[in-house]
Amino acid sequence: MAQQRALPQSKETLLQSYNKRLKDDIKSIMDNFTEIIKTAKIEDETQVSRATQGEQDNYEMHVRAANIVRAGESLMKLVSDLKQFLILNDFPSVNEAIDQRNQQLRALQEECDRKLITLRDEVSIDLYELEEEYYSSSSSLCEANDLPLCEAYWRLDLDADSADGLSAPLLASPETGAGPLQSAAPVHSHGGGPGPTEHT
């Protein structure tokens, strides 16, 4: 722990005044309370009448009770002054509190980072296993070279399109064959007509 630096003269004087106020107020409370206890004790007969003595004791108790209240208020004011002094002048304690808070936050950040890294690794492993299971279950759709699933579906679509293209000409072949037969029909219809003339 670093050695505490010496306070400036003004601060040292202020602390001494606070210490003196504390001692004076405590002494005032103790003295007045002791005198109130003494006044409450019944004394022997004196030259002063009991009524007069009673009024005097009552007045003295009120005064000493007021002194106790004043000393208590002074102590409360002293506590407030000490808090203000510590807030405004106790920079080492403030810096230490800030450092402790920073260390706590750093430790929390490191813990969160470790948990996130662990979660990332677990998710990566699970995702890899799911991908392997998915591609192995769809291996029947792939070729021998183990194409990706999207390319396998793409090739299946191409095969289906080519099959449709081959079946269409087969169905249309009778219609195409009717053309030459219809074109040959006029030849037979003119069979009774004169034949072509020969040129010499």
From Swiss-Prot:
InterPro entries: Med22
Chief site of localization: nucleus
Key words of the record: Activator, Coiled coil, Nucleus, Transcription, Transcription regulation
One cellular-component annotation, GO: core mediator complex
Gene Ontology biological-process entries: positive regulation of transcription elongation by RNA polymerase II; positive regulation of transcription initiation by RNA polymerase II; RNA polymerase II preinitiation complex assembly
Transcription keyword on record: yes
The UniProt record lists the keyword tRNA processing: no
Record-level Gene Ontology MF annotations: transcription coregulator activity
Compartments, as annotated in UniProt: Nucleus
Ranges for region Disordered: 169-200
Composition bias, Gly residues: 190-200
Coiled coil: 93-122
Family: Belongs to the Mediator complex subunit 22 family.
Biological function: Component of the Mediator complex, a coactivator involved in the regulated transcription of nearly all RNA polymerase II-dependent genes. Mediator functions as a bridge to convey information from gene-specific regulatory proteins to the basal RNA polymerase II transcription machinery. Mediator is recruited to promoters by direct interactions with regulatory proteins and serves as a scaffold for the assembly of a functional preinitiation complex with RNA polymerase II and the general transcription factors.
Subunit structure: Component of the Mediator complex, which is composed of MED1, MED4, MED6, MED7, MED8, MED9, MED10, MED11, MED12, MED13, MED13L, MED14, MED15, MED16, MED17, MED18, MED19, MED20, MED21, MED22, MED23, MED24, MED25, MED26, MED27, MED29, MED30, MED31, CCNC, CDK8 and CDC2L6/CDK11. The MED12, MED13, CCNC and CDK8 subunits form a distinct module termed the CDK8 module. Mediator containing the CDK8 module is less active than Mediator lacking this module in supporting transcriptional activation.
Protein name: Mediator of RNA polymerase II transcription subunit 22
Organism, as annotated: Mus musculus
